[in-house]
Swiss-Prot record:
A Pfam family: EGF
Name of the protein in question: Abnormal pharyngeal pumping eat-20
TM helices/strands, residue ranges: 750-770
Species of origin: Caenorhabditis briggsae
Keyword list, A-Z: Disulfide bond, EGF-like domain, Glycoprotein, Membrane, Repeat, Signal, Transmembrane, Transmembrane helix
GO molecular function terms listed in the Swiss-Prot or TrEMBL record: calcium ion binding
Composition bias, Polar residues: 570-579
Cytoplasmic compartment segments: 771-811
């Protein structure tokens, strides 16, 4: 029995809690009186829109606004449902029913006891979007049984899935629920029940006459009692207990005394409206404008623009039809795209750059949409005025004009080696201008300009024309070997401290001690040249023959006699400078024409690659020679004798190369420590060579230098002066003989044959292994059983019993 009572008690508590919870979940109130609301958004396609709920009137005693309809496009309130005033002065604390129906023409509001109101809407030519709101500031104190379009609000906070429902500060429960009379009974009925109930003496302990008359409690006066709101404004009590006015659209101020439309004189029957405190004129259909001052004409009298406006509308300006373009378009017919919109077209010049359309863009007419032309303007860093960004950002390097033979670039001499290159236009004649200046304190600098105009243009060269500025050339003393790898068939231009020169007037030699410096080698791809001196009457004939440029007859003889592949490098790729402090250099300037031949022979025929260039160039070259090594040739020599001597020296050098292993550093790892010896002025032009040669001839042989380089590599203690020409290097010739080609082909065939034999042997061994494996597996798995084979053989030759007579079978 006790257990049964406990179960009943628990069940009763559960039912009571469930009922209370269901009541709480179905009742809602706004926790924020100033910002709480419930909003639906719908268009005319959702009409008619119906709903309803039960409510408790506002605790402020003011009229309770149950529903507000606002035009979403303009913000104008179209209509409201306000609860009618009851006998208690809007202080009734009981649940009342309310329902509504929204249509395109108006709002119908239904209240209990048959009360109803209707609000008509103004007609609109455009489709409307409605915003339906329940505001906490003027709305009901509590709500329950909310049903919209047959959908009931569920959850806490409430949730409705249709018409974009949103709610702010709307929560479950109601703090005023105890004061509401859910059964609809009034206080008078409660008094009557107490009056009819039996009187017990137990409760009459004190005589009523002794108590006297007690004054009923009175509420303090509302702050809005003395706060008047003009122009139908509504007085509200804030959370701080102060009175404030809620003004209608078109009015503002503390008491709604200011009319925002008072200063807007709408014309031609226009009505002033207000949206968020901003006044505007709502014009009749026949008028338009800010104050409805413009009257519409008939369509037949509408302005016609020729050509037709593509991205705008045709309007009358000063009595003339003109195109009024939309944003982003310009031109006479609005068919020119404004590419300067947003200054994105000039963003590559920085944030301060601005884009400006050309002046004629607003008058340009086009049949199709085109991009407008524009200019990018940037502020000048000095005076701040806007100039063309292209001119402001143009490179400041000095370029050589086609008509100028030479340009002096630099007047300021830095304390470190400088190499500046400026590109010359491709179509201009190629002009190589090298300007050198000196910074020696004891002797004024005399710039020497070397100009090599070329009549033949080679488009394959990467540097069609360039200007090189470098520091003065000075004599140096160092010993190093630089070997250029075969792929780099290039010229070498040395920037840094090099031998310097003096003017043509004789000067006294002066010794200037200069600390050791570092010479940097710059490589520019260019065509090799063969430099020759033209024979002059009564003078010595000198010819500088490139060691790797033999004639066609000599090439054929070398192909027949040579059986090995040789690779010969030009003279400037291998440089050795003797370190002798006693050597005194003399300098001069001489001008002579330079002849360059350019040929290409087929590799497949004689495996010879030769690159030469055919042009005649006047040039100015500076030669250097120690004072102790000066050679002069009295008798002129012929070119054939010199070439034969060169060929013999090449053969001797090849034998030395085959027996000695040459080790050299790559060109990118080569630096030459140089020193500055005495400077000697030489007034008389003469050719000076640092390498001693026989007196009968003056030659430059690459093979001799290479053999000396090998001896220098083997023994670093022995220092031998080497030939160093400041002129451009000769070409590089690769000789590949036919015997080497045949030997490499035979070796390739032998290797291929051996590979095929090995592959065939592997395939044969694999096949034998597979066959052996199959045979062994058949024996192991019973497929090859000798007993079974014997039984099958005997059964095949045995006579069946059907062919034997019955008597024989019985026997």
């Amino acid at each position: 029995m006790t257990t049964f009572c406990r179960v009943l008690l628990i069940f009763g508590i559960y039912v009571a809690v469930s009922c209370a919870q269901s009541v709480e979940d179905d009742v809602f109130h706004f926790t924020n009186p100033s910002q709480g609301n419930a909003v639906w958004i719908l268009d005319e396609s959702s009409l008619p829109w119906t709903g309803g709920y039960q409510f408790l009137r506002s605790i402020s005693g003011m009229p309770t606004t149950l529903l507000s309809i606002v035009d979403s496009s303009t913000g104008v309130t179209l209509g409201q449902c306000v609860a009618p005033q009851d006998a208690t002065g809007n202080f009734s604390k009981r649940w009342e029913k309310f329902s509504w129906e929204l249509t395109a023409s108006g709002l119908d509001c239904q209240f209990e006891q048959g009360a109803a109101t209707r609000v008509e809407f103004d007609r609109s030519q455009n489709p409307r979007t409605f915003s339906i709101r329940i505001q906490s500031i003027t709305g009901p104190a509590c709500l329950r049984d909310v049903v919209v379009q047959t959908e009931q609000a569920t959850g806490c906070p409430p949730h409705l899935s249709r018409n974009s429902f949103t709610a702010n500060a709307l929560n479950c429960s109601c703090p005023y629920l105890d004061a509401a009379n859910e059964d609809g009974e009034t206080e008078n009925e409660d008094v009557d029940m107490l009056a009819n109930s039996p009187q017990f003496p137990l409760f009459k302990v004190v005589d009523p006459s002794v108590l006297g008359s007690a004054n009923p409690p009175t509420l303090p006066p509302s702050p809005c009692a003395n706060h008047e709101c003009h122009n139908n404004g509504t007085c509200l009590v804030s959370q701080e207990g102060a009175a404030m006015c809620l003004c209608r659209n078109g009015f503002t101020g503390d008491r709604c005394e200011l009319d925002v439309c008072s200063a807007v004189p709408c014309q031609n029957g226009g009505v002033c409206r207000s949206n968020n405190g901003i006044a505007y004129c709502e014009c009749p259909p026949a008028f338009s404008g800010l104050l409805c001052e413009s009257a519409h004409t008939d369509e037949s009298a509408a302005p016609i623009c020729n050509p037709e406006c593509s991205n705008g509308q045709c309007v009358l300006k000063d009595g003339q039809p003109q195109c009024e373009c939309r944003q982003g378009f310009t031109g006479a017919n609005c068919n020119v795209l404004d590419v300067c919109l947003g200054d994105a077209a000039c963003s590559m010049f920085g944030p301060s750059a601005k884009c400006v359309l050309d002046d004629n863009m607003d008058k340009m007419s086009s049949a199709s949409l085109i991009n407008g032309t524009y200019d990018c303007l940037c502020p000048h860093p000095i005076h701040g005025q806007f100039v063309d960004c292209m001119q402001l950002h143009a490179p400041s390097a000095t370029s050589v004009q086609p008509s100028e033979p030479a340009v002096v670039i630099n007047n300021v001499t830095p304390s470190f080696p400088v190499l500046e290159i400026s590109q010359v236009p491709t179509g201009a004649p190629k002009t190589f201008t090298a300007t050198s200046t000196t910074s020696v304190a004891t002797q004024p600098a005399v710039p020497v300009v070397q100009t090599l105009p070329t009549t033949q243009q080679v488009p394959s060269e990467p540097f069609v024309g360039f200007t090189v500025t470098r520091e003065p050339l000075r004599p140096f003393e160092a010993t190093t070997t630089t070997t250029l790898p075969p792929p780099f068939q290039q010229h070498i231009i040395t920037a840094g401290e090099q031998p310097t020169w003096s003017s043509q007037q004789p000067q006294q030699p002066s010794e200037v001690p200069v600390p050791a410096q570092t010479m940097t080698t710059f490589i520019f791809p260019q065509t090799p040249e063969t430099t020759t001196f033209p024979p002059t009457t009564g003078a010595t004939v000198h010819k500088f023959v490139s060691p790797n440029m033999p004639d066609e007859n000599e090439e054929e003889e070398e192909d027949e006699t040579t059986d090995e592949t040789e690779e010969t490098f030009p003279t400037p790729s291998t440089m050795q400078v003797a370190t002798d402090s006693s050597i005194r250099s003399e300098f001069f300037t001489s001008t002579f024409p330079t002849t360059t031949d350019m040929e290409e022979t087929d590799e497949e025929e004689d495996m010879t690659e030769e690159v030469t260039d055919s042009s005649t160039q006047p040039s100015t070259t500076v030669f250097i020679q120690p004072s102790s090594t000066t050679f002069t040739t009295e008798a002129p020599t012929t070119t054939m004798e010199e070439e034969e001597t060169t060929e013999q020296e090449e053969i001797e050098s090849e034998e030395a190369i085959s027996t000695t292993t040459q080790t050299s550093l790559p060109f990118w790892m080569t630096t030459i420590a140089i020193k500055m010896p005495d400077i000697v002025a030489s007034p008389t032009p003469m050719i000076i060579m640092p390498h001693p040669q026989p007196e009968e001839k003056m030659e430059t042989s690459t093979e001799g230098i290479e053999s000396e380089e090998e001896r220098t590599t083997e023994s670093n203690e022995e220092i031998i002066p080497k030939n160093m020409e400041p002129t451009t290097p000769s070409d590089i010739t690769h000789h590949h003989t036919s015997s080497g080609k045949q030997s490499s082909a035979v070796a390739s065939w032998i290797i291929a044959t051996i590979a095929l034999i090995v592959l065939g042997s592997l395939l044969l061994a694999t096949s034998l292994f597979v066959l052996r494996y199959i045979r062994q597996s058949r024996k192991l798995h019973g497929k090859y059983n000798p007993a079974r084979e014997e039984h099958n053989l005997s059964a095949a030759y045995a006579m069946p019993m059907s062919h034997i007579a019955k008597e024989e079978r019985l026997i």
